[in-house]
Regions:
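Conserved GNAT acetyl-CoA-binding A-motif
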Residues: 118-129
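Short linear interaction segments
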Residues: 180-217
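Active-site acidic-Proline motif in GNAT/NAT acetyltransferases
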Residues: 95-100, 104, 132-133
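Conserved acetyl-CoA-binding loop-helix of GNAT-fold acetyltransferases
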Residues: 103-116, 120, 139-143
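A short beta-loop-alpha structural element at the N-terminal edge
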Residues: 11-25
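Glycine-rich phosphate/pyrophosphate-binding loop shared by adenosine-nucleotide-utilizing enzymes
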Residues: 8-10, 71-77, 163
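Conserved catalytic-core motifs of GNAT/GCN5-like acyltransferases
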Residues: 127-130, 142, 147-163
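Acetyl-CoA-dependent GNAT
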Residues: 17, 37, 41-99, 111-112, ...
């Protein structure tokens, strides 16, 4: 999969163990750019740890990791981590994008790839957590249908400050999709009704004003 415009040429590929060094380099960059991740400028681990992590994901039929490549550098990363046994219908999701590429569509492309993988592999529920003040990420998740189901107080601690996290999920079951369509339609109808009320109110007010002006001497 690729994102190509006159300004952007991005390739999205599945992770390989030989990409470990590039991934470490990437995590050090993004870890220094934002406090929205579980790691800082130290990155996600050493070469052995990262290679083992990629191997573990690659060997699990319900897990996947994608990298967004710009030339020879990773500028985005997302993964689906499947669960086992009675929770095998669920998976956890995580994503990060280099700050230089925010707003380029990479986040949407990575999330779309992961959702497609989940559907193809029988995953019904995708869970994620994100800082409660990470408005950009929350907006992205909502765009794809994720719903907030709770909040975890003191989810992380950075420089002595406790950070809360929103817990969100995406239900991929067909029944749920139909329910979401109905809810979206009902919200739209509610907005239309409110707009009609406002139009009717303004019309009545205008008529009253006109009537008032007519009876004045």
């Amino acid at each position: 999969m690729s994102i190509f415009t006159p300004e952007v040429n991005i390739m999205i590929k599945e992770a390989r163990t030989e990409d470990a060094a590039k991934l470490i380099e990437y995590t050090k960059i993004v870890g220094a750019q934002t406090d929205n991740l579980s790691f800082g400028k130290e990155g996600a681990g050493d070469t052995h740890e990262v290679e083992e992590f990629i191997k573990k994901i690659s060997s699990d039929p319900n897990s996947v990791m994608y990298f967004a490549w710009k030339n020879d550098d990773i500028v985005g990363c997302a993964n689906i981590s499947g669960m086992k046994r009675r929770m095998s219908h669920r998976a956890n999701f995580a994503i990060s994008v280099a700050k230089s590429e925010w707003g380029s569509g990479i986040g949407s492309a990575l999330l779309e790839k992961c959702i497609s993988f989940a559907k193809d592999n029988g995953i019904e529920i995708i869970n994620l957590d994100t800082r409660s003040d990470n408005i950009r990420a929350i907006s992205l998740y909502k765009k794809f249908g994720f719903i907030k189901i709770g909040q975890m107080p003191a989810f992380s601690k950075i420089n002595g400050e406790y950070i809360d996290a929103d817990l969100m999920y995406l239900d991929l079951r067909e029944k749920s999709n139909n329910r979401r369509k109905i809810e979206a339609y009902e919200r739209l109808e509610a907005i239309r009704r409110e707009n009609k009320k406002e139009i009717d109110f303004n019309k009545e007010r205008e008529e009253a004003m006109n009537k008032k002006h007519k009876i004045q001497p």
